[in-house]
A protein has these predicted regions:
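...captures the hydrophobic TM-helix bundle architecture rather than a specific catalytic motif
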Residues: 1-325
């Protein structure tokens, strides 16, 4: 508990340093921007805040790993441990050494492993394949974290390693998706709010993953790297997988935590609006990228196709905002 408290309470001062520095050099902090746009202490405060966050995440990950390994029942082998615990274990191991996007997505997948059996009214299709998929994602996570950086001057060998590592995540992701679909197949499904969010999350996870497979190939990545394709892919993954899985889990556990039942009608309206808005925003951004719209801009020339698609993106964003309200 003390280590956990230390890790948690390091987050507010780190966030304060990052925000109060007002560093204006994008979230990657490329040197050109960091020198021109953020002179003075802004960049130093931003970097120091990230260092504190890094220490916090390392301490939190150590706490999770030790807790899971030491506090589980002695007669419970790792192979039989609940898949949600496996999700936390593997994401913590990845965070200790490398922090790919998988580290944020794995807990959301673990949430779905709690939701699908409950509302399909049957056990998970294959516990062992879920364990294998989490393990594989942990391994390839160490060889995929630089797949955002093909265009930054890495050697051909380095780019090849990270490309293969990223593509190796496809079988693991497919195993999770197949597991969820096979669990639902033949089950007596109760389409309550949590499983609707989980199903939507899997659909968007598959869509984002399909785009990621294409984008992980070096030839296409150099074309789409500085375009809205990357913006659409990344945020479809974050919104579609992480947020949808987490919100579904919140709905699932809300009655257990509060002793009160949520409104099924409002929950389903929340899901439908969020799903429609997400599709409108991030699928359209993929198309914008293919039409050549660059990212990191605050304005764009009056190209008719760009204008029309950005209107669609704005409509989708308002729909998401209304759904979350």
């Amino acid at each position: 508990p003390k280590l956990n408290a230390v890790a948690f309470w390091m987050i507010p001062p780190a966030g304060a340093l990052i925000w109060l520095g007002f560093a204006d050099f994008t979230w990657y902090a490329y040197p050109t921007y960091s020198v021109i746009s953020a002179p003075g202490p802004a960049a130093d405060m931003w970097i120091f805040g990230l260092k504190i966050l890094g220490v916090s995440s390392i301490l939190g990950s150590i706490n999770f790993v030790v807790t899971i390994m030491k506090c589980k029942h002695p007669d419970l082998p790792l192979s039989k441990m609940p898949l949600l615990a496996w999700a936390y274990l593997t994401s913590s191991l990845i965070t200790l050494v490398a922090v790919p996007t998988f580290a944020a997505a794995i807990p959301a997948i673990g949430f779905m492993y709690e939701i699908f059996p409950r509302f399909s009214r049957k056990p998970i299709f294959s516990h062992s394949s879920g364990v294998a998929a989490f393990t594989l994602l942990t391994i390839v996570g160490f060889a995929s974290w630089a797949h955002h950086m093909y265009a930054t001057g890495m050697s051909f060998t380095e780019k090849t390693v990270f490309m293969v590592g990223t593509l190796a995540a496809v079988p693991a992701s497919a195993m999770h998706t197949f597991n969820f679909l096979a669990t639902m197949w033949g089950g007596r499904i109760k389409f309550a709010t949590p499983i609707m969010w989980a199903v939507g999350g899997i659909a968007l996870f598959f869509s984002a993953g399909a785009g990621g497979v294409v984008n992980s190939a070096m030839p296409l990545d150099f074309i789409t790297h500085d375009s809205y394709w990357v913006v659409g892919h990344f945020h479809l993954f974050v919104m579609g997988t992480i947020l949808f899985g987490t919100v579904g889990f919140v709905y699932y556990f809300f009655p257990y935590v509060t002793g009160r039942m949520y409104s099924e009608v409002l929950g389903k309206v929340h899901f439908i609006l969020s799903f429609v808005g997400t599709v409108l925003v991030f699928f359209t951004q993929h198309i914008l990228g293919l039409f050549g719209m660059p990212r990191r801009i605050y304005d764009y020339p009056p190209i008719p196709e760009w204008i029309q698609m950005n209107i669609i993106v704005s409509i989708g964003a308002f729909i998401i905002g209304i759904s979350m309200a």
